[in-house]
Amino acid sequence: MLSFLGKSVALLAALQATLSSASPLATEERSIEKRANGYANSVYFTNWGIYDRNFQPADLVASDVTHVIYSFMNLQADGTVVSGDTYADFEKHYADDSWNDVGTNAYGCAKQLFKVKKANRGLKVLLSIGGWTWSTNFPSAASTDANRKNFAKTAITFMKDWGFDGIDVDWEYPADATQASNMVLLLKEVRSQLDAYAAQYAPGYHFLLTIAAPAGKDNYSKLRLADLGQVLDYINLMAYDYAGSFSPLTGHDANLFANPSNPNATPFNTDSAVKDYIKGGVPANKIVLGMPIYGRSFQNTAGIGQTYNGVGGGGGGSTGSWEAGIWDYKALPKAGATIQYDSVAKGYYSYNAGTKELISFDTPDMINTKVAYLKSLGLGGSMFWEASADKKGADSLIGTSHRALGGLDTTQNLLSYPNSKYDNIRNGLN
């Protein structure tokens, strides 16, 4: 999900509400509308975060979060969804896990997230498939009816075995009209199989279906937005990665608006993407506004919208938290830097005049501004990439969003999975 804006990811909540229509889809749409009773405050949790970052499911501040999107599952060309890290996903034994359990049991993040769900009944967990690295096989997986059915079946198998509440598809990105059409068919198949599973094993429960969607026009202009708005519960708009090592000049990472007086600093902006999604047929209340919990750095620069030389990793004592040019929010601002605000673009950045390093990132004030913006347009809530990078306490971006949003969605998660392959999930960890 952390994508360069050639990728510009945007997850948007989308269920086209044509309430005047008497079609079965409109009826289903109305019932889904009633299920969410407040704003979404969603966060991506990465399975690789349990290693060097040492961020475990128990570290989530669950009271601030409505949806945890567990990333990522891989997929094969025939649509088969597979674990990309079996140890992290369901094998790792945590301190309170016994090595003497009888039967077949899930461990790893699957069990830990189920424990979080049990303790926080308003928190839903979704299984995310793809991402920037693992999107290669989506065109093939979506290209035939057989592959689409296989994708849906294998995705739902993991979902019910691990005790999750829905599926998130992160295809980066459909490249043409054919792929965009096949994406819709793929999502319709997943929706159909989710509903069939619910009818048999969880009557009355609605499993969620979401996507990550791009904020870059070159990518979202290819999508069938109105169709996505009908089949999905949420479209999470990845409204970040607007500038970085791929950019010719320094710029804002996640600005709300363009700045006509400094266009080099705002090659992209969130407002244009949001308005285009709505014009394209996505109901505003299904759009979830993505926000970054990281900053992008530029070195040897005089300021925003100007030339730079490097982003880190090439000397000068600056690299990044985990990769060159990308800093966890909890490491910012760096010592010696002062925070600047572009009041036109609505974007913050830090600048150190001595080292000539600029880092664009969201602050708590920026989150408050973005939440006010999304509320003004009737959007569905906030989404964050990703959980391990946040600060604790009053400066948490996720927590700031919760406080600014006010009433979060409290619809209950599901704890009953009678046909999970794992004894402990099937028994509700009892």
UniProtKB/Swiss-Prot annotation:
GO terms for cellular component: extracellular region. The antagonistic activity of Trichoderma harzianum is used for the control of several soil borne plant pathogenic fungi. Residues 1-22 form the signal peptide. Its main location: secreted. Chitin binds at G103, T104, G130, G131, W132, T133, Y173, M238, A239, Y240, D241, W385. The active site is at E172 (proton donor). Secreted chitinase involved in the degradation of chitin, a component of the cell walls of fungi and exoskeletal elements of some animals (including worms and arthropods). Plays a morphogenetic role during apical growth, cell division and differentiation (cell wall morphogenesis). Also acts as an antifungal agent. Involved in the degradation and further assimilation of phytopathogenic fungi, namely mycoparasitism, the major mechanism accounting for the antagonistic activity against phytopathogenic fungi displayed by Trichoderma. This is Endochitinase 46. The gene is chit46.
